[in-house]
Amino acid sequence: MTKPNHELSPALIVLMSIATGLAVASNYYAQPLLDTIARNFSLSASSAGFIVTAAQLGYAAGLLFLVPLGDMFERRRLIVSMTLLAAGGMLITASSQSLAMMILGTALTGLFSVVAQILVPLAATLASPDKRGKVVGTIMSGLLLGILLARTVAGLLANLGGWRTVFWVASVLMALMALALWRGLPQMKSETHLNYPQLLGSVFSMFISDKILRTRALLGCLTFANFSILWTSMAFLLAAPPFNYSDGVIGLFGLAGAAGALGARPAGGFADKGKSHHTTTFGLLLLLLSWLAIWFGHTSVLALIIGILVLDLTVQGVHITNQTVIYRIHPDARNRLTAGYMTSYFIGGAAGSLISASAWQHGGWAGVCLAGATIALVNLLVWWRGFHRQEAAN
């Protein structure tokens, strides 16, 4: 990519952070509404959980097949077009009269909301090398805040006008954001000479040849699976006795997650200073311990909030560290690196949603916590038994 004469100003960083959060939020508005949507369409818990899975599978497909286009086409035009198409997907969801139609709209929204993952490497490219980790951390905080605050906003809007109102409003906001991005982003022309099949092939080539990318992608996959296991079934827990919370109250729990996400921002700075292996080890240990507090959440709201704070802090911290590390590998191929890493990341999220819904249906909250703790332990063992030693040496 040709780097333009365009400063990465604080205002532009804020715009890109908001755009990233708004785009990815479109995949998560449904989570606190699952109980309501399930009753609307007469669905079981596991069937309702597939709505979230469809969004994440659509997102994973977009990561693999659309994000590499950021290394091929002019980025501003690509970003604005995908933002408008994501808005169109939410219009389908808002007007759906069947589960099949809702899944179609959700999948299309997920497919094009990967625009968030074109904005992240764009910010990394515009940032100076000594501030790259910090900038990526800020943009990624916007992304995770979007995921978490989506639940709060969705719950409040659903209380005011029903669950469909959430998607009507979100669609309008995405259209307005497309206009703001058109006005605010610099133009960046591609310098790659690869065609589309070669771009996709290079993603797989990087996976085959680069141990660090494979390691970080696996860590991201397992970490985000943990995140999805918690948030997919939490609406069912909080809507049932002894809590019996409304959609609006359930959505407010996203604020606890948002606080945890903000607390992880320094992880990018630590990675800039060469301490990525320390933040990864510490984060994965805390991730495992967070499930103890989450388990007590079936009777204690305070324990659940503490668990949410710790889990979201560690998920975001490890994620920021992962991206800061992989962006050092091939500076001219950051969109393709993002495609490979984030495809693994959201495949983990989709798998976590399915595991969570099934665990809830068959084992209740104890089953959900057991599934989450098991995957957290596997993640820690994968890192501890060799990966972190090689990366620290590198």
UniProtKB/Swiss-Prot annotation:
GO MF assignments: transmembrane transporter activity
Principal location listed in the UniProt entry: membrane
Membrane spanning residue stretches: 10-30, 50-70, 79-99, 100-120, 138-158, 166-186, 218-238, 243-263, 291-311, 337-357, 364-384
Membrane topology category: Multi-pass membrane protein
UniProt KW keywords: Cell inner membrane, Cell membrane, Membrane, Transmembrane, Transmembrane helix, Transport
Keyword Transport: yes
Gene3D superfamilies: MFS general substrate transporter like domains (1.20.1250.20)
InterPro entries linked to this entry: MFS, MFS_dom, MFS_trans_sf
Keyword Cell inner membrane appears in the UniProt entry: yes
GO cellular component, one term: plasma membrane
Subcellular location: Cell inner membrane
Species per Swiss-Prot/TrEMBL record: Escherichia coli (strain K12)
Domain of life: Bacteria
Family: Belongs to the major facilitator superfamily.
Name of the protein described by the UniProt record: Putative uncharacterized transporter YgaY
